[in-house]
Amino acid sequence: MADTLNHLPEPQKGEDLYRYLLERVTNLEDRNTELREQLRQIEADKRYLETQKVRYEREVRKFKGEIEQMKSPPLVIGTVTDLIDENRVIVRSSAGPRFLVGISQSLNIEEIKPGARCTLNQQSLAIVEILPTNYDAQIYGMEVIEAPSERYEEIGGLEKQINEIREAVELPLKKPEVFRKMGIEPPKGVLLHGPPGTGKTLLARAVAHQTEAHFLRVVGSELVQKYIGEGARLVRELFELAKKKSPSIIFIDEIDAIGASRTESNTSGDREVHRTLMQLLAEMDGFSNRGDVRIIGATNRIDILDRALLRPGRFDRIIEIPAPDIEGRVSILNIHCAGMNIDKKVDIRDIATRTDGKNGADLRSICMEAGMFAIRSDHEMVTLEDFEQSIEKFSNDFERDSLINTSGAMFA
């Protein structure tokens, strides 16, 4: 374009000179606009390249750090056994021998306590880092991460029991100031007992849904271990984790598996169960305070539980979960039939009258079987006839009462 401007013909007259100058100015303005646009594009490219440079430099530093970490020698795992002074401690390495070692200046001396796990430098064996407390994998498996979906409204016929468990477990966690105002200690343990299928575990699941406390669930048989001391260690770590994450609730289902009365048994298995029970008694109400940890126990056999387990201070409230009466059965049937397509001729109270002696689990099965009969008969909705067939089938399929009442020997 510059050559074009330089080779424009020379103007001969005034009018030609005007047009010549106007055209030259226009060309210069266009050239200026073009150069400005190129400048903006170059500056944008420069900013993009600078951003890319910073990103690549960051990635290079990251990869260099990973390479250095891979090149660094591994650290030795040890356990602090004794504190000599602010600069020296006695540790036991993972190999077994004990050493008197120094402490890294970057560590907080208050974190170094006997029993703490630490990492040691391979050359000097100086303490480099304090590791978090390690719990058995089974203990982490007892944590309830996702709250159950059951609610108190879905439990029928247990209004009194629900109020008692909410007062003993939920109220101290949500309104502790009420107990401080009255000058009393809130209940720390609740034992639910009653026949199978009456809703003990369902109540505990509703508590887990309702409270915002950390919830840990364990079956009593999980605490029975093969080797000496393993069951007691699990109990100790379970309560340590509960205290660490307090406020928390520990639910021990089928507690009679480890809580049966102690007898003069000569078998090693029974003695190990007794050791586990004694550790549980000490953790529930022993020398040290267990903190803001609530305990819910559930059992079908309260008659065989050890007396030391039932005393106040361990289980302050013992709540019986009985088989539902007529009103309770009506409430339970209404809950289970709420989502079913039922004929209007079906009288829930009449069905409740016909199911005398049945518990909540039985009533749920009766509703499910009635729905299955309706599907089998290709009905549009569940009819009274379907419920009658379900009740008859449930009574005749298995001689449940005769099986329950039949006495027999128990084999280990």
From Swiss-Prot:
ATPase which is responsible for recognizing, binding, unfolding and translocation of substrate proteins into the archaeal 20S proteasome core particle. Is essential for opening the gate of the 20S proteasome via an interaction with its C-terminus, thereby allowing substrate entry and access to the site of proteolysis. Thus, the C-termini of the proteasomal ATPase function like a 'key in a lock' to induce gate opening and therefore regulate proteolysis. It is found in: Cytoplasm. Residues 15-72 form a coiled coil. ATP binds at residues 197-202, 336. The keyword Nucleotide-binding applies. Its main location: cytoplasm. Residues 410-412 are annotated as: Docks into pockets in the proteasome alpha-ring to cause gate opening. Homohexamer. The hexameric complex has a two-ring architecture resembling a top hat that caps the 20S proteasome core at one or both ends. Upon ATP-binding, the C-terminus of PAN interacts with the alpha-rings of the proteasome core by binding to the intersubunit pockets. The keyword ATP-binding applies. InterPro entries: 26S_Proteasome_ATPase, AAA+_ATPase, AAA_lid_3, ATPase_AAA_core, ATPase_AAA_CS, NA-bd_OB-fold, Nucleotidase_PAN, P-loop_NTPase. GO terms for molecular function: ATP binding; ATP hydrolysis activity. Consists of three main regions, an N-terminal coiled-coil domain that may assist in substrate recognition, an interdomain involved in PAN hexamerization, and a C-terminal ATPase domain of the AAA type. Keywords: ATP-binding, Chaperone, Coiled coil, Cytoplasm, Nucleotide-binding, Proteasome. Belongs to the AAA ATPase family. One of its GO terms (cellular component) is cytoplasm. It comes from Methanosphaerula palustris (strain ATCC BAA-1556 / DSM 19958 / E1-9c). This is Proteasome-activating nucleotidase. GO terms for biological process: proteasomal protein catabolic process; protein unfolding.
